[in-house]
Amino acid sequence: MARWQRVYWLRSLFFALVTSVNSLSLPQSENPAFPGTLICDKDEVRVEFSSRFDMEKWNPSLVDTFGNEISNCTYALDLEKFILKFPYETCTIKVIGGYQVNIRVQDTNADVSYKDDVHHFFCPAIQAEIHEVSEIVVCMEDLISFSFPQLFSRLADENQNVSEMGWIIKIGNGTRVHTLPLKDAIVQGFNLLIDSQKITLHVPANATGVAHYVQESSYLYTVQLKLLFSSPGQKITFSSQAICAPDLSVACNVTHMSLTIPEFPGKLKSVGFGQRNIPEDQWHANGIDKEATNGLRLHFRKSLLKTKPSEKCPFYQFYFSSLELTFNFQGDMLSTVIDPECHCESPVSIDELCTRDGFMDFEVYSHQTKPALNLESLLVGNSSCQPIFKVQSLGLARFHIPLNGCGTRQKFEGDKVIYENEIHALWENPPSNIIFRNSEFRMTVRCHYIRDSMLLRAHIKSHSSPVASVKPGPLALVLQTYPDISYQRPYRKNEYPLVRYLRQPIYMEVTVLNRNDPNIKLVLDDCWATTFEDPASVPQWQIIMDGCEYELDNYRTTFHAANSSAAHSGHYQRFDVKTFAFVSESRGLSSLIYFHCSALICNQASPLCSVTCPAPLRNKREASKEGTMTVSLPGPIILLSDDSSSKGVMNPDSYEITKDIASKTLGAVAALVGSAVIIGFICYLHKKRIVRFNS
């Protein structure tokens, strides 16, 4: 039985070797006496006969296993191209793994048929492509391991023979795909392992196609993998993606662990540790803060971390066990697991040098030990010296002790004068089931002077300071819009684009920022509107020219004085724009409008501050153009016509304009009707008078 299984497997292997990976057409030539080639297509079988074959003499037909012609088989025979086509369902016999094809080629002139006239073929069943996604990805420093389910057990029996047969590896980085046959991939360090349970592919971290991202000392790489296997009748695609962060930069201070993630196309959505998974919008509330400049930095409060004794450190070490980072990468949610840990840290921070005025400064952090220190029990030496600052909730105590007090000792080592003391503290809430070798915390603190150091006092006589050179600084102007004429609160940047309808005025203001000088004044030069964000783009609608209403505009801009309560009213320029100004017969209504203004700052006494409207000449302020500054609205304004279906509640000012126009129109119509009645009545009297005269 095993021998026949071996023969069947070798037969399948033969088909795999002669079949193209991407083609579904399988040429069959089992019977060399057959005068043609049989091709197994996806939907039908095609037989191509030799051009020397006499189709009329040799009549090909499809028969069953007994040699009888299949009655319901409908086939197409092209005598000119020497091609025979027929479907699988009605013209073949379905067997395990495919279809049996029996073709009889018989001389039509012969009276007797022979058994050797029937030729037998086999077409494997064409199966749909199978897609498998790996859920087991293991990141290591120098390779990534992908595991996939085993779909064909016989491959495990001949792993050495089939490992390079029909396999293609594709590695992508989002923009380019690198394709390798398995035999070439193995040479480059890839490894494919197949057993009865799974298929495992090892991809080197330095393989072509793996994308690497580095920032400072942080290192991260991403892999997009496709492993393809093709054999007659089937095509299997194993796919997976991975984000690996084998070496992220970790920095720890007294209160936080900081983790640096290089900038790459993925976006971090959540972090998980222990039994917790914390989404981005809940980080701050759970003791995690982020910085999103030049990559991403996460700051974890140390209360979230675990501690462990370490042979490398004299004190306990803070760490995360299996910190899971979940990213949105290329439309998929991918996770990577890391184990960051803080370097060895001391619960006491001390300046190496003693202070110049004869003191030793150091800080004690209660949470740098396990259990934490009880700051209330802190002692320095054998004295009662207290810290100058202590907050139990922050876990911090700061000392400033004299070198000639609090039990500080002095000694000489080489060229240094060393001052040292010892601090004592009790543990805070130690667990009852743990026996401590020491009942209290003890640590020696020290600072030093260089032995030949000498404190000098000097008086340095300096020259008088130079006179400051005064020049105007850069201007800071802003252009804003307001909901109404009260100019109470401008629209914020996130409220753009704004929506306005025809007949609604747009209230604008140009303001000087960060200037308190009452002697300066803001003067508008030009204001205009464009359909693009660029102030220099065309077309343009002029709103203000040389500080005056644009004379060619049918709907003039109206200026508004700043309130008397406003500080430095000369620092403001307020006006409203009529939306009719942006409608013309040739252009129609532009739905998206950007506004821009150029302005200058001048001294109140300067002639430049005097604006006469209408401006007599365009070159009135040409000499001052270098001092102007162009500002734009934070965003565009969408203009809608009156009949827009999206129009909501009408603005009160708009309503008044509409009501005024309607009343005037109604009055005109009434006057016209009245005139017609009067003229008709006069004509009637005149006609009646003529009739009387004739009679």
From Swiss-Prot:
<feature type="disulfide bond">
    <location>
        <begin position="527"/>
        <end position="597"/>
    </location>
</feature>
<dbReference type="InterPro" id="IPR048290">
    <property type="entry name" value="ZP_chr"/>
</dbReference>
<keyword id="KW-0325">Glycoprotein</keyword>
<feature type="disulfide bond">
    <location>
        <begin position="73"/>
        <end position="91"/>
    </location>
</feature>
<keyword id="KW-0732">Signal</keyword>
<feature type="disulfide bond">
    <location>
        <begin position="40"/>
        <end position="123"/>
    </location>
</feature>
<feature type="domain" description="ZP">
    <location>
        <begin position="353"/>
        <end position="616"/>
    </location>
</feature>
<feature type="disulfide bond">
    <location>
        <begin position="354"/>
        <end position="447"/>
    </location>
</feature>
<dbReference type="GO" id="GO:0042802">
    <property type="term" value="F:identical protein binding"/>
</dbReference>
<keyword id="KW-1003">Cell membrane</keyword>
<feature type="topological domain" description="Cytoplasmic">
    <location>
        <begin position="686"/>
        <end position="695"/>
    </location>
</feature>
<dbReference type="GO" id="GO:0016234">
    <property type="term" value="C:inclusion body"/>
</dbReference>
<feature type="propeptide" description="Removed in mature form">
    <location>
        <begin position="620"/>
        <end position="695"/>
    </location>
</feature>
<keyword id="KW-0165">Cleavage on pair of basic residues</keyword>
<feature type="glycosylation site" description="N-linked (GlcNAc...) asparagine; partial">
    <location>
        <position position="72"/>
    </location>
</feature>
<dbReference type="InterPro" id="IPR017977">
    <property type="entry name" value="ZP_dom_CS"/>
</dbReference>
<feature type="transmembrane region" description="Helical">
    <location>
        <begin position="665"/>
        <end position="685"/>
    </location>
</feature>
<dbReference type="GO" id="GO:0035804">
    <property type="term" value="F:structural constituent of egg coat"/>
</dbReference>
<dbReference type="InterPro" id="IPR051148">
    <property type="entry name" value="Zona_Pellucida_Domain_gp"/>
</dbReference>
<dbReference type="GO" id="GO:0007339">
    <property type="term" value="P:binding of sperm to zona pellucida"/>
</dbReference>
<dbReference type="GO" id="GO:0005771">
    <property type="term" value="C:multivesicular body"/>
</dbReference>
<dbReference type="GO" id="GO:0002455">
    <property type="term" value="P:humoral immune response mediated by circulating immunoglobulin"/>
</dbReference>
<dbReference type="GO" id="GO:0005886">
    <property type="term" value="C:plasma membrane"/>
</dbReference>
<comment type="function">
    <text>Component of the zona pellucida, an extracellular matrix surrounding oocytes which mediates sperm binding, induction of the acrosome reaction and prevents post-fertilization polyspermy. The zona pellucida is composed of 3 to 4 glycoproteins, ZP1, ZP2, ZP3, and ZP4. ZP2 may act as a secondary sperm receptor.</text>
</comment>
<dbReference type="Pfam" id="PF23740">
    <property type="entry name" value="Ig_ZP2_3rd"/>
</dbReference>
<feature type="region of interest" description="Disordered">
    <location>
        <begin position="451"/>
        <end position="473"/>
    </location>
</feature>
<dbReference type="InterPro" id="IPR042235">
    <property type="entry name" value="ZP-C_dom"/>
</dbReference>
<comment type="subunit">
    <text>Can form homopolymers that assemble into long fibers (in vitro). Polymers of ZP2 and ZP3 organized into long filaments cross-linked by ZP1 homodimers. Interacts with ZP3.</text>
</comment>
<keyword id="KW-0472">Membrane</keyword>
<keyword id="KW-0272">Extracellular matrix</keyword>
<keyword id="KW-0964">Secreted</keyword>
<feature type="signal peptide">
    <location>
        <begin position="1"/>
        <end position="24"/>
    </location>
</feature>
<dbReference type="Pfam" id="PF23736">
    <property type="entry name" value="Ig_ZP2"/>
</dbReference>
<comment type="similarity">
    <text>Belongs to the ZP domain family. ZPA subfamily.</text>
</comment>
<keyword id="KW-1015">Disulfide bond</keyword>
<dbReference type="Pfam" id="PF23738">
    <property type="entry name" value="Ig_ZP2_N"/>
</dbReference>
<dbReference type="InterPro" id="IPR055356">
    <property type="entry name" value="ZP-N"/>
</dbReference>
<feature type="topological domain" description="Extracellular">
    <location>
        <begin position="25"/>
        <end position="664"/>
    </location>
</feature>
<dbReference type="GO" id="GO:0005783">
    <property type="term" value="C:endoplasmic reticulum"/>
</dbReference>
<keyword id="KW-0675">Receptor</keyword>
<feature type="site" description="Cleavage; by ASTL">
    <location>
        <begin position="156"/>
        <end position="157"/>
    </location>
</feature>
<feature type="glycosylation site" description="N-linked (GlcNAc...) asparagine">
    <location>
        <position position="253"/>
    </location>
</feature>
